[in-house]
A protein has these predicted regions:
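Hydrophobic targeting/anchoring helices
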Residues: 100, 243-349
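Boundary/entry segment of secreted carbohydrate-active catalytic domains
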Residues: 1-14
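Aromatic-rich peripheral "rim/lid" segments of glycoside hydrolase catalytic domains that contact
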Residues: 82, 92-94, 155, 340-349
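Conserved, mostly hydrophobic/aromatic
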Residues: 4, 25, 33, 62, ...
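Short, well-ordered coil/turn segments that N-cap beta-strands
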Residues: 1-2, 29-31, 63-69, 131-136, ...
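Aromatic-lined substrate-binding rim segments of carbohydrate-active enzymes
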Residues: 18-99, 122-126, 228-236
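Polysaccharide-binding and catalytic clefts of secreted carbohydrate-active enzymes
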Residues: 96-264, 268-282
Protein backbone atom coordinates (compact mmCIF):
# COMPACT_ATOMS: atom_id res chain seq x y z
CA UNK A 1 0.00 0.00 0.00
CA UNK A 2 1.21 3.47 -0.89
CA UNK A 3 -0.64 6.66 0.02
CA UNK A 4 -1.49 8.74 3.03
CA UNK A 5 -3.84 10.90 5.04
CA UNK A 6 -5.88 13.22 2.82
CA UNK A 7 -8.17 15.99 4.08
CA UNK A 8 -9.93 17.32 0.97
CA UNK A 9 -12.66 19.12 2.92
CA UNK A 10 -10.15 21.97 3.27
CA UNK A 11 -10.40 22.65 -0.48
CA UNK A 12 -14.01 21.85 -1.39
CA UNK A 13 -14.27 25.33 -2.91
CA UNK A 14 -11.31 24.57 -5.18
CA UNK A 15 -12.18 21.59 -7.41
CA UNK A 16 -9.10 22.35 -9.49
CA UNK A 17 -6.90 21.61 -6.47
CA UNK A 18 -8.70 18.34 -5.77
CA UNK A 19 -8.35 17.24 -9.38
CA UNK A 20 -4.65 18.07 -9.35
CA UNK A 21 -4.17 16.17 -6.07
CA UNK A 22 -5.69 13.01 -7.52
CA UNK A 23 -3.65 13.37 -10.71
CA UNK A 24 -0.44 13.63 -8.71
CA UNK A 25 -1.35 10.72 -6.42
CA UNK A 26 -1.95 8.54 -9.45
CA UNK A 27 1.29 9.68 -11.06
CA UNK A 28 3.16 8.78 -7.86
CA UNK A 29 1.74 5.26 -7.97
CA UNK A 30 -0.37 5.73 -4.87
CA UNK A 31 -3.22 3.29 -4.37
CA UNK A 32 -4.90 4.38 -1.12
CA UNK A 33 -5.88 7.50 0.82
CA UNK A 34 -7.14 7.91 4.38
CA UNK A 35 -10.22 10.13 4.48
CA UNK A 36 -12.40 11.64 7.19
CA UNK A 37 -10.14 11.53 10.24
CA UNK A 38 -11.21 15.02 11.40
CA UNK A 39 -14.40 15.47 9.36
CA UNK A 40 -17.20 15.22 11.94
CA UNK A 41 -18.02 18.94 11.82
CA UNK A 42 -18.18 18.74 8.02
CA UNK A 43 -20.36 15.63 8.05
CA UNK A 44 -22.67 16.95 10.77
CA UNK A 45 -22.45 20.77 11.05
CA UNK A 46 -25.54 20.81 13.25
CA UNK A 47 -26.93 18.01 15.38
CA UNK A 48 -28.83 15.55 13.20
CA UNK A 49 -28.00 17.33 9.92
CA UNK A 50 -25.75 15.16 7.76
CA UNK A 51 -23.79 16.04 4.61
CA UNK A 52 -22.03 13.20 2.79
CA UNK A 53 -22.25 14.25 -0.87
CA UNK A 54 -18.73 15.71 -0.89
CA UNK A 55 -17.25 12.46 0.43
CA UNK A 56 -19.15 10.41 -2.16
CA UNK A 57 -17.67 12.64 -4.84
CA UNK A 58 -14.10 12.31 -3.56
CA UNK A 59 -14.32 8.54 -3.07
CA UNK A 60 -15.80 8.10 -6.54
CA UNK A 61 -13.01 10.12 -8.15
CA UNK A 62 -10.29 8.34 -6.19
CA UNK A 63 -11.71 4.94 -7.10
CA UNK A 64 -11.95 5.89 -10.77
CA UNK A 65 -8.21 6.54 -10.64
CA UNK A 66 -7.31 3.28 -8.93
CA UNK A 67 -7.04 4.77 -5.43
CA UNK A 68 -8.90 3.03 -2.60
CA UNK A 69 -10.23 4.70 0.53
CA UNK A 70 -9.24 3.97 4.11
CA UNK A 71 -12.29 5.53 5.74
CA UNK A 72 -11.79 6.94 9.22
CA UNK A 73 -14.44 7.48 11.85
CA UNK A 74 -14.25 11.10 13.05
CA UNK A 75 -14.61 10.66 16.81
CA UNK A 76 -11.18 12.17 17.56
CA UNK A 77 -12.31 15.73 16.78
CA UNK A 78 -15.74 16.77 18.05
CA UNK A 79 -17.94 19.44 16.44
CA UNK A 80 -18.58 22.62 18.41
CA UNK A 81 -22.31 21.93 18.76
CA UNK A 82 -21.57 18.76 20.71
CA UNK A 83 -19.52 20.62 23.32
CA UNK A 84 -22.02 23.48 23.51
CA UNK A 85 -25.07 21.24 23.91
CA UNK A 86 -23.46 18.52 26.01
CA UNK A 87 -20.65 20.08 28.10
CA UNK A 88 -20.07 16.77 29.90
CA UNK A 89 -18.32 15.61 26.70
CA UNK A 90 -15.48 18.02 27.45
CA UNK A 91 -12.60 16.57 29.39
CA UNK A 92 -11.67 17.70 32.91
CA UNK A 93 -7.93 18.16 33.34
CA UNK A 94 -5.70 17.14 36.24
CA UNK A 95 -6.39 20.45 38.01
CA UNK A 96 -10.15 19.81 37.94
CA UNK A 97 -10.85 22.36 35.20
CA UNK A 98 -13.28 21.42 32.43
CA UNK A 99 -11.76 22.28 29.08
CA UNK A 100 -13.46 24.47 26.51
CA UNK A 101 -14.09 23.42 22.94
CA UNK A 102 -10.88 23.25 20.98
CA UNK A 103 -7.80 21.18 20.17
CA UNK A 104 -8.71 17.50 19.54
CA UNK A 105 -8.57 14.15 21.32
CA UNK A 106 -9.81 15.83 24.50
CA UNK A 107 -13.19 14.25 25.12
CA UNK A 108 -14.41 12.36 28.17
CA UNK A 109 -14.52 8.67 27.25
CA UNK A 110 -16.92 7.95 30.12
CA UNK A 111 -19.58 10.47 29.06
CA UNK A 112 -22.63 8.45 27.94
CA UNK A 113 -23.77 11.18 25.54
CA UNK A 114 -20.36 11.26 23.84
CA UNK A 115 -20.52 7.53 23.20
CA UNK A 116 -24.11 7.87 21.99
CA UNK A 117 -23.32 10.64 19.50
CA UNK A 118 -20.24 8.80 18.25
CA UNK A 119 -22.42 5.75 17.66
CA UNK A 120 -24.82 7.86 15.57
CA UNK A 121 -22.18 9.27 13.22
CA UNK A 122 -20.32 5.97 12.88
CA UNK A 123 -23.48 4.06 12.00
CA UNK A 124 -24.40 6.76 9.49
CA UNK A 125 -21.01 6.41 7.82
CA UNK A 126 -21.21 2.62 7.73
CA UNK A 127 -24.69 2.68 6.21
CA UNK A 128 -23.73 5.37 3.69
CA UNK A 129 -20.40 3.97 2.48
CA UNK A 130 -20.34 0.31 3.48
CA UNK A 131 -21.09 -0.83 -0.07
CA UNK A 132 -18.81 1.60 -1.87
CA UNK A 133 -16.47 -0.39 -4.15
CA UNK A 134 -13.57 1.86 -3.18
CA UNK A 135 -13.81 1.17 0.57
CA UNK A 136 -10.62 -0.69 1.52
CA UNK A 137 -10.67 -0.63 5.33
CA UNK A 138 -11.96 1.23 8.40
CA UNK A 139 -9.68 3.49 10.43
CA UNK A 140 -11.30 3.91 13.87
CA UNK A 141 -10.85 7.38 15.40
CA UNK A 142 -7.27 8.63 15.66
CA UNK A 143 -4.32 8.18 18.02
CA UNK A 144 -6.32 7.25 21.11
CA UNK A 145 -5.08 8.56 24.44
CA UNK A 146 -5.62 11.16 27.15
CA UNK A 147 -7.02 11.15 30.67
CA UNK A 148 -10.13 12.72 32.17
CA UNK A 149 -10.81 13.53 35.84
CA UNK A 150 -14.52 14.36 35.80
CA UNK A 151 -17.29 12.99 38.02
CA UNK A 152 -18.36 10.46 35.38
CA UNK A 153 -14.84 9.05 35.24
CA UNK A 154 -14.60 8.99 39.03
CA UNK A 155 -17.84 7.02 39.35
CA UNK A 156 -16.78 4.63 36.58
CA UNK A 157 -13.39 4.15 38.27
CA UNK A 158 -15.06 3.13 41.53
CA UNK A 159 -17.18 0.58 39.65
CA UNK A 160 -14.03 -0.77 37.99
CA UNK A 161 -12.31 -1.06 41.38
CA UNK A 162 -15.26 -2.92 42.89
CA UNK A 163 -15.17 -5.42 40.04
CA UNK A 164 -11.42 -5.91 40.42
CA UNK A 165 -11.03 -6.06 44.21
CA UNK A 166 -14.52 -7.06 45.40
CA UNK A 167 -13.85 -5.70 48.90
CA UNK A 168 -12.22 -2.61 50.37
CA UNK A 169 -10.05 -4.84 52.54
CA UNK A 170 -8.51 -6.37 49.41
CA UNK A 171 -8.05 -2.94 47.84
CA UNK A 172 -6.44 -1.47 50.96
CA UNK A 173 -4.05 -4.40 51.19
CA UNK A 174 -3.06 -4.17 47.50
CA UNK A 175 -2.44 -0.43 47.72
CA UNK A 176 -0.78 -0.53 51.18
CA UNK A 177 -3.09 2.26 52.28
CA UNK A 178 -2.19 2.15 55.96
CA UNK A 179 0.95 4.12 55.17
CA UNK A 180 0.26 7.88 55.38
CA UNK A 181 -3.22 7.12 56.69
CA UNK A 182 -4.75 6.39 53.30
CA UNK A 183 -7.06 3.58 54.42
CA UNK A 184 -10.50 3.66 52.75
CA UNK A 185 -13.65 2.57 54.59
CA UNK A 186 -16.22 3.55 51.93
CA UNK A 187 -15.96 3.26 48.15
CA UNK A 188 -17.07 6.87 47.74
CA UNK A 189 -14.00 8.02 49.67
CA UNK A 190 -11.84 7.06 46.68
CA UNK A 191 -11.11 10.01 44.39
CA UNK A 192 -9.20 10.08 41.14
CA UNK A 193 -5.42 10.50 41.43
CA UNK A 194 -4.67 13.90 39.95
CA UNK A 195 -2.84 17.12 40.80
CA UNK A 196 -5.50 17.89 43.42
CA UNK A 197 -4.90 14.62 45.26
CA UNK A 198 -2.00 12.18 44.83
CA UNK A 199 0.03 13.57 41.94
CA UNK A 200 2.82 16.08 41.86
CA UNK A 201 4.01 17.33 38.51
CA UNK A 202 2.16 15.77 35.58
CA UNK A 203 3.13 12.10 35.75
CA UNK A 204 4.53 11.56 39.25
CA UNK A 205 2.50 10.00 42.04
CA UNK A 206 2.75 9.90 45.84
CA UNK A 207 0.50 6.84 45.87
CA UNK A 208 1.50 4.45 43.12
CA UNK A 209 -1.19 1.80 43.63
CA UNK A 210 -4.14 4.05 42.86
CA UNK A 211 -2.29 5.71 39.97
CA UNK A 212 -1.46 2.40 38.30
CA UNK A 213 -5.04 1.21 38.66
CA UNK A 214 -6.37 4.48 37.27
CA UNK A 215 -4.14 4.08 34.22
CA UNK A 216 -5.35 0.50 33.75
CA UNK A 217 -8.95 1.67 34.09
CA UNK A 218 -8.33 4.48 31.62
CA UNK A 219 -6.82 2.14 29.04
CA UNK A 220 -9.80 -0.20 29.32
CA UNK A 221 -12.28 2.69 29.20
CA UNK A 222 -10.75 4.03 25.99
CA UNK A 223 -10.68 0.49 24.59
CA UNK A 224 -14.43 0.24 25.24
CA UNK A 225 -14.94 3.31 23.04
CA UNK A 226 -12.83 1.78 20.29
CA UNK A 227 -14.70 -1.54 20.52
CA UNK A 228 -18.04 0.26 20.28
CA UNK A 229 -16.99 1.75 16.95
CA UNK A 230 -15.36 -1.50 15.80
CA UNK A 231 -18.55 -3.45 16.41
CA UNK A 232 -20.67 -0.78 14.71
CA UNK A 233 -18.79 -0.93 11.40
CA UNK A 234 -18.38 -4.71 11.57
CA UNK A 235 -22.14 -5.15 11.92
CA UNK A 236 -22.59 -3.45 8.54
CA UNK A 237 -19.37 -4.48 6.76
CA UNK A 238 -18.20 -7.76 8.34
CA UNK A 239 -15.66 -8.43 5.58
CA UNK A 240 -13.95 -5.02 5.67
CA UNK A 241 -10.86 -5.01 7.95
CA UNK A 242 -10.70 -2.58 10.87
CA UNK A 243 -7.76 -0.92 12.60
CA UNK A 244 -6.76 2.19 14.52
CA UNK A 245 -3.44 4.01 14.47
CA UNK A 246 -1.22 3.24 17.47
CA UNK A 247 1.85 5.20 18.56
CA UNK A 248 4.76 2.89 19.27
CA UNK A 249 6.01 3.09 22.86
CA UNK A 250 3.02 5.12 24.02
CA UNK A 251 2.73 4.29 27.73
CA UNK A 252 -0.85 5.34 28.35
CA UNK A 253 -2.56 2.36 26.69
CA UNK A 254 -2.04 -1.40 26.97
CA UNK A 255 -1.48 -2.07 23.28
CA UNK A 256 -1.09 -5.82 23.84
CA UNK A 257 -4.71 -5.90 25.02
CA UNK A 258 -5.82 -3.59 22.21
CA UNK A 259 -4.25 -5.85 19.57
CA UNK A 260 -6.83 -8.54 20.31
CA UNK A 261 -9.54 -6.27 18.93
CA UNK A 262 -7.70 -5.05 15.82
CA UNK A 263 -7.83 -6.95 12.54
CA UNK A 264 -4.26 -5.80 11.95
CA UNK A 265 -1.89 -3.33 13.59
CA UNK A 266 -1.25 0.13 12.20
CA UNK A 267 0.87 2.86 13.71
CA UNK A 268 2.23 6.37 13.18
CA UNK A 269 6.01 6.85 13.04
CA UNK A 270 7.11 10.35 14.06
CA UNK A 271 10.70 10.10 15.34
CA UNK A 272 11.95 12.85 17.61
CA UNK A 273 15.17 14.61 16.65
CA UNK A 274 17.21 12.50 19.06
CA UNK A 275 15.72 9.11 18.08
CA UNK A 276 18.31 6.75 16.64
CA UNK A 277 17.61 4.29 13.79
CA UNK A 278 17.73 1.56 16.45
CA UNK A 279 14.95 3.24 18.45
CA UNK A 280 12.78 3.54 15.34
CA UNK A 281 13.49 -0.12 14.58
CA UNK A 282 12.44 -1.13 18.09
CA UNK A 283 9.13 0.73 17.66
CA UNK A 284 8.46 -1.20 14.45
CA UNK A 285 9.32 -4.48 16.21
CA UNK A 286 6.97 -3.69 19.10
CA UNK A 287 4.12 -2.94 16.71
CA UNK A 288 4.72 -6.18 14.84
CA UNK A 289 5.16 -8.17 18.03
CA UNK A 290 1.91 -7.23 19.81
CA UNK A 291 -0.07 -9.26 17.26
CA UNK A 292 2.09 -12.34 17.05
CA UNK A 293 4.49 -11.14 14.40
CA UNK A 294 1.87 -10.37 11.76
CA UNK A 295 2.73 -7.67 9.21
CA UNK A 296 1.52 -4.20 10.13
CA UNK A 297 0.63 -0.96 8.37
CA UNK A 298 2.70 2.21 8.62
CA UNK A 299 -0.30 4.55 8.67
CA UNK A 300 1.50 7.90 9.01
CA UNK A 301 4.92 9.53 8.76
CA UNK A 302 5.78 13.10 7.87
CA UNK A 303 7.73 14.15 4.79
CA UNK A 304 8.16 17.59 6.39
CA UNK A 305 7.94 18.44 10.12
CA UNK A 306 5.88 17.50 13.17
CA UNK A 307 3.64 19.86 15.12
CA UNK A 308 4.55 18.73 18.64
CA UNK A 309 8.33 19.24 18.66
CA UNK A 310 9.67 22.60 19.92
CA UNK A 311 11.93 22.60 16.86
CA UNK A 312 12.47 20.23 13.93
CA UNK A 313 15.78 19.16 12.47
CA UNK A 314 16.13 19.49 8.72
CA UNK A 315 15.92 16.06 7.13
CA UNK A 316 19.06 15.06 5.27
CA UNK A 317 18.60 14.00 1.64
CA UNK A 318 17.35 10.43 1.43
CA UNK A 319 16.18 10.18 5.06
CA UNK A 320 12.51 9.90 4.10
CA UNK A 321 13.34 7.05 1.75
CA UNK A 322 15.40 5.33 4.45
CA UNK A 323 12.59 5.61 7.02
CA UNK A 324 10.15 4.15 4.50
CA UNK A 325 12.41 1.25 3.57
CA UNK A 326 13.15 0.60 7.24
CA UNK A 327 9.42 0.21 7.95
CA UNK A 328 9.02 -2.28 5.09
CA UNK A 329 12.10 -4.20 6.25
CA UNK A 330 10.52 -4.59 9.69
CA UNK A 331 7.24 -5.95 8.34
CA UNK A 332 5.16 -3.01 7.15
CA UNK A 333 2.82 -3.66 4.24
CA UNK A 334 2.62 0.05 3.48
CA UNK A 335 4.46 3.32 3.06
CA UNK A 336 2.07 6.14 3.93
CA UNK A 337 2.29 9.81 4.86
CA UNK A 338 0.56 12.67 6.68
CA UNK A 339 -0.69 14.81 4.93
CA UNK A 340 -1.02 14.37 1.17
CA UNK A 341 -1.52 18.12 0.83
CA UNK A 342 -0.21 20.39 3.56
CA UNK A 343 -2.80 22.56 5.31
CA UNK A 344 -2.64 26.30 4.67
CA UNK A 345 -3.18 27.14 8.33
CA UNK A 346 -3.78 25.89 11.89
CA UNK A 347 -1.76 23.35 13.83
CA UNK A 348 -0.47 20.89 11.25
CA UNK A 349 0.22 23.22 8.35
Amino acid sequence: MHGGDYNPEQWLDRPDILEEDIRMMKKAGMNCATLGVFSWSTYEPREGEFHFAWLHDIMDKLYANGIYTILATPSGARPAWLDETYPECRRVDSYGVREHHGVRHNHCMSAPVYRKKVSVIVNKLADEFGNHPGLLMWHISNEYGGECYCENCEKAFRVWLKEKYKTLDALNKAWNTRFWGHTFYEWDEIVLPDLRSEHFEYDRSQFQGITLDYKRFNSESILECYKQEYEAVKSVTPDIPVTTNLMGFFKMLDYKMWAKYMDFISWDNYPANEDSPAMIAMNHELMRGIKGGQPFILMEQTPSVTNWLPYNALKRPGVMRLWSYQAVAHGSDSVMFFQMRRSVGACEK
